[in-house]
């Protein structure tokens, strides 16, 4: 045992050195990020990331570290560097931005994000407790250059109507709803009338360290000018553009279905009669990977996840597709089952 204690102490020292090196790596990444910010160069450069990944794999081959482990370490340090660089201020021409619902989770995130880029941020929110930015009325907020609607889906259309009525034709207006169907008619009508409207969906939550390397969907609602200006605001992110009518169908799979799979998986485990400790003790590699995602989902905001399931009308089709897929897993013949998995592998390529 004393010998084991000595070896474990040595491992602890090695771990400290590793974390020290990661910290030093972050310091260098920050300096690189500052240089990128000066020229508005992109934070994420896929070709450079591939070089880093291969560098780790090659180094691992010489030190007895498997390629899979080397790749995962590379991704961890690269992702850390991206967040370090993504948090750096990238100042833009200052504009006044009012966030309706700015004291909620994503409202706070957006307020800090825009303020860090040099914009003048105010919020309009009935809940003012702990507000970090000036709180204004909707009428005053509507005088801003940019107005962001960050409210629950259930009241968003009414808020949008009020904002359109109170604001000038020059104001850029967009929502960040996870479900677009309730506001599409009003957004399209406003777009046809020449208003600068679009619809945005950051594909991450308020726990995100930065927007860099993360997806932001910009939906066109008839005003290219508004969509272009929204894209500039989020230009450190990976921008995907689509028509607003396409959004909910895609979201039904990337949000509704992916959430439902993990929630249903966890529910099946809860009702299995096993404790989590018992199943972890005999876990397979796949089970460990699946539960790593499912435990994060289980600890998310249940009210928000309920809303995502219920408020997107396209979710029913996605969940029926899932039900059919589960049925196929249960009933297909051997050859059909193998063919199904082969098709899945091809789809992911």
Features from the language model and the residues they span:
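Conserved N-terminal Rossmann-fold NAD(P)-binding element of oxidoreductases
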Residues: 98-101
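NAD(P)-binding Rossmann-fold cofactor-contacting core
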Residues: 116-133
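Extended, charge-rich alpha-helical interface modules
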Residues: 1-95, 112, 116
């Amino acid at each position: 045992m004393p010998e084991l204690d000595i070896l474990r102490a040595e491992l602890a020292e090695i771990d400290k050195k590793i974390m020290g090196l990661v910290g030093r790596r972050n310091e260098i990444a920050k300096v690189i990020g500052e240089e990128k910010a000066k020229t508005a160069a992109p934070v994420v450069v896929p070709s450079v990331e591939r070089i880093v990944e291969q560098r780790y794999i090659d180094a691992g081959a010489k030190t007895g570290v498997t390629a899979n482990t080397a790749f995962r370490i590379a991704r961890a340090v690269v992702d850390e560097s991206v967040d370090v660089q993504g948090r750096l201020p990238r100042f833009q021409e200052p504009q006044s931005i009012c966030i309706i619902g700015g004291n909620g989770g994503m409202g706070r995130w957006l307020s800090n994000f825009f303020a860090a880029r040099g914009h003048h941020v105010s919020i309009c929110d009935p809940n003012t407790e702990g507000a970090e930015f000036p709180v204004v009325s909707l009428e005053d907020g509507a005088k801003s250059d940019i107005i962001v609607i960050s409210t629950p889906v259930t009241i968003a259309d009414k808020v949008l109507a009020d904002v359109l009525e109170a604001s000038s034709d020059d104001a850029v207006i967009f929502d960040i709803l996870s479900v677009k169907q309730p506001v599409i008619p009003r957004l399209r009508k406003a777009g046809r009338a020449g208003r600068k409207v679009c619809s945005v969906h950051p594909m991450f939550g308020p726990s995100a360290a930065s927007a860099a390397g993360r997806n932001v969907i910009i939906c066109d609602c008839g005003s290219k000018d508004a969509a272009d200006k929204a894209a500039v605001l989020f230009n450190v992110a990976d921008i995907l553009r689509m028509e607003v009518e396409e959004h909910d169908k895609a979201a039904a799979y990337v949000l509704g279905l992916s959430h439902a799979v993990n929630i249903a998986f966890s529910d099946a485990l809860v009702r299995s009669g096993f404790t989590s400790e018992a199943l972890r003790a005999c876990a397979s590699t796949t089970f460990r990977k699946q539960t790593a995602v499912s435990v994060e989902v289980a600890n998310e905001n249940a009210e928000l996840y309920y809303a995502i399931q219920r408020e997107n009308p396209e979710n029913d089709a996605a969940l029926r597709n899932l039900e059919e897929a589960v049925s196929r897993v249960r009933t297909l013949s051997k050859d059909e089952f193998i063919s199904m998995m082969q098709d899945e592998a091809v789809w992911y390529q």
